[in-house]
Amino acid sequence: MRKSFYSWLMTQRNPKSNAPVAILADLVFDDTTFPKHTNDFELISRYLEDQASFSFNLGQFDEIWEDYLAHQYVDKKESYRLF
């Protein structure tokens, strides 16, 4: 089962980093209404565009989403190796 985007994003938090993923992670951490239990791209993208209490470049979000998907694929491959 895939980790929610929020769960994965929280592993990317780093207040000292200027990387877009770290910035988004810190913004989302402080946003109490962010959809935490989903991995639905459309739902999260619409939330960031229409409802988030902060502004974030959606082009950068698309890149971060691709990184999230890549990590999910790697994690899945690693779990198969355990068996």
Curated annotation (Swiss-Prot):
One Pfam family recorded for the sequence: YozE_SAM_like
InterPro entries referenced in this protein's UniProt entry, alphabetically: UPF0346, YozE_SAM-like, YozE_SAM-like_sf
Entry superkingdom: Bacteria
NCBIfam families: PRK13672.1
Family: Belongs to the UPF0346 family.
This protein's name: UPF0346 protein M28_Spy0369
Record organism: Streptococcus pyogenes serotype M28 (strain MGAS6180)
Organismal lineage: Bacteria, Bacillati, Bacillota, Bacilli, Lactobacillales
